Amino acid sequence: MKYDIIGDIHGCLQEFQNLTEKLGYNWSSGLPVHPDQRKLAFVGDITDRGPHSLRMIEIVWELVIHKKVAYYAPGNHCNKLYRFFLGRNVTIAHGLETTVAEYEALPSHKQNMIKEKFITLYEQSPLYHILDEKRLLVCHAGIRQDYIGRQDKKVQTFVLYGDITGEKHADGSPVRRDWAKEYKGTTWIVYGHTPVKEPRFVNHTVNIDTGAVFGGRLTALRYPEMETVSVPSSLPFVPEKFRPIS
């Protein structure tokens, strides 16, 4: 099986359409379909900050849950939206406010439909996907070699948030260790979460979050070809979001 793994979309629907078309997908049915049966995989954070979060929920639900032709691994923004939909007490900030604004503008029956679809998508998707006979792992923020196969709280925190130190940058975002430098496994780890100006290959890991929602690009990794394909963002460039990885 061949995969096209998509970086953090964050509601950037137009960029997602442009990228999938560049990858050879046809949208005539209203969904991206590849003539060679390549499958899409999403590294999470499909919502928040961008303009079309709810449409992205519908598309990914349709591909992953209804048609079962794609893979989705949730990100930290997905986890927070899930908790919001469950009625938990979450802070409506850091991008969630854009998704909530879209949601609250809907009539109640459409709200219920979106909520049910996202809850189903989240609950029926694993923390990470192991594909191609363990040669490939798709997740949100990365995973240590010794965590592969585990699902406990410590691993969940790492996979959703990265290797956080507990310290904060001046803008309140967490300081993260560069776990990829220490990774010695042979399974390819494809992930996103931390915006980088160019796809970042380190050992057998690839960060494909090139900051579409911050005016960078939306990037896919073609597997097993190990080629990256990108399209430019239509949004304003926010340089401070592309912080060097320490």
UniProtKB/Swiss-Prot annotation:
Superkingdom to which the source organism belongs: Bacteria
Transmembrane segments: none
GO molecular function list: bis(5'-nucleosyl)-tetraphosphatase (asymmetrical) activity; GTP binding; nickel cation binding; phosphatase activity
Pfam families: Metallophos
Broad enzyme group: hydrolase
GO CC terms: cytoplasm
UniProt keyword list: GTP-binding, Hydrolase, Nickel, Nucleotide-binding
EC number: 3.6.1.17
Cofactor(s) in the UniProt record: Ni(2+)
Reaction(s) catalysed (UniProt annotation): P(1),P(4)-bis(5'-guanosyl) tetraphosphate + H2O = GMP + GTP + 2 H(+)
PANTHER family: BIS(5'-NUCLEOSYL)-TETRAPHOSPHATASE PRPE [ASYMMETRICAL], METALLOPHOSPHOESTERASE
Family: Belongs to the PrpE family.
Function of the protein: Asymmetrically hydrolyzes Ap4p to yield AMP and ATP.
Protein name: Bis(5'-nucleosyl)-tetraphosphatase PrpE [asymmetrical]
Origin species: Bacillus anthracis
